[in-house]
């Protein structure tokens, strides 16, 4: 009797594509989030490079005074930037096909919107891809949660702030000096240095740097030597080894005596959670602060808070900051308006005659 064995029907093309996309054996994991991440980030990066090199000047304030941002129009690496979309466009969605010509699209700063929207989609998908890969490998999801902090910060300055201010022209320019200009104008208009959420962000970033340096130096100083004196201590580590590579008891004892006992972690898991949570929470708060100041819920104002018995103002640092803010405000967009809002709101004295 002869048995006939039929070959199992091969998986469909779509099935093989799905298996390849979700395979953790690839050198670089793609994932379903990666299907959207790759084209959006490639688009944002390509347009950024081309525009940074060759984009013509942009009428950022909508007053027919174009501002140059590209290298071919007189800028260098420090001064160059992708100039934000014109105030004449406001918050309108402005793809190339909405303009009468490519020249008009470039003049009104269309590349900025294109780059920012693709970039935000891309980094959000990168965060989703981190979660997806963690899920496939049976890991916990906290890598994606930590990455949500810079994603929130980027979304705040590139999307939420322009929405609150009513125009993409108020978004952060994509360049070094453009970033500093954004920071200075933000301080002038919103007094961000006096906002508690910004203070928490400063503590998060500087504190995170301090804790990272402390942790790295403590671990490096308490390695368990597996090599001779003639070899680097780093050569004594084998990838995937089960043994501890450093003596946490020695590190705990050192730091506990340097400061005091309870300033030092004796639990490695608690320590690493703290190292991750401190900067992440700080940056979350800063992003939240930017998002509230976008709608003009600004930093604290203690101007002229201290007076003497005669009612005369005794200047404090709050008043110094206020004068600096006014100076910065009158300098920016100097041709777009005659006076900044603070000065324009002052009642004009009446004259007889």
UniProtKB/Swiss-Prot annotation:
Protein name as catalogued: Photosystem II protein D1
Site feature (Tyrosine radical intermediate) residues: 161
Site features described as Stabilizes free radical intermediate, chain residue numbers: 190
Record: residues binding chlorophyll a PD1: 198
Record note on cofactor: The D1/D2 heterodimer binds P680, chlorophylls that are the primary electron donor of PSII, and subsequent electron acceptors. It shares a non-heme iron and each subunit binds pheophytin, quinone, additional chlorophylls, carotenoids and lipids. D1 provides most of the ligands for the Mn4-Ca-O5 cluster of the oxygen-evolving complex (OEC). There is also a Cl(-1) ion associated with D1 and D2, which is required for oxygen evolution. The PSII complex binds additional chlorophylls, carotenoids and specific lipids.
Record PTM: Tyr-161 forms a radical intermediate that is referred to as redox-active TyrZ, YZ or Y-Z. C-terminally processed by CTPA; processing is essential to allow assembly of the oxygen-evolving complex and thus photosynthetic growth.
Modified residues (Phosphothreonine): 2
GO biological process, one term: photosynthetic electron transport in photosystem II
UniProt miscellaneous comment: 2 of the reaction center chlorophylls (ChlD1 and ChlD2) are entirely coordinated by water.
Xref: Pfam families: Photo_RC
Family according to the record: Belongs to the reaction center PufL/M/PsbA/D family.
NCBIfam families per UniProt: psbA
Membrane topology: Multi-pass membrane protein
Residues the entry annotates as binding [CaMn4O5] cluster: 170, 189, 332-333, 342, 344
Residue sites binding a quinone per the record: 215, 264-265
Protein keywords: Acetylation, Calcium, Chlorophyll, Chloroplast, Chromophore, Electron transport, Herbicide resistance, Iron, Magnesium, Manganese, Membrane, Metal-binding, Oxidoreductase, Phosphoprotein, Photosynthesis, Photosystem II, Plastid, Thylakoid, Transmembrane, Transmembrane helix, Transport
Regions crossing the membrane: 29-46, 118-133, 142-156, 197-218, 274-288
Site entry (Cleavage), positions: 344-345
GO terms of molecular function: chlorophyll binding; electron transporter, transferring electrons within the cyclic electron transport pathway of photosynthesis activity; iron ion binding; oxidoreductase activity, acting on diphenols and related substances as donors, oxygen as acceptor; oxygen evolving activity
Residues that make up the propeptide removed upon maturation: 345-353
Function field: Photosystem II (PSII) is a light-driven water:plastoquinone oxidoreductase that uses light energy to abstract electrons from H(2)O, generating O(2) and a proton gradient subsequently used for ATP formation. It consists of a core antenna complex that captures photons, and an electron transfer chain that converts photonic excitation into a charge separation. The D1/D2 (PsbA/PsbD) reaction center heterodimer binds P680, the primary electron donor of PSII as well as several subsequent electron acceptors.
CDD domains: Photosystem-II_D1 (cd09289)
Subunit relationships: PSII is composed of 1 copy each of membrane proteins PsbA, PsbB, PsbC, PsbD, PsbE, PsbF, PsbH, PsbI, PsbJ, PsbK, PsbL, PsbM, PsbT, PsbX, PsbY, PsbZ, Psb30/Ycf12, at least 3 peripheral proteins of the oxygen-evolving complex and a large number of cofactors. It forms dimeric complexes.
N-acetylthreonine modification, residue list: 2
Localisation: Plastid, Chloroplast thylakoid membrane
Organism: Calycanthus floridus var. glaucus
Residues binding Fe cation: 215, 272
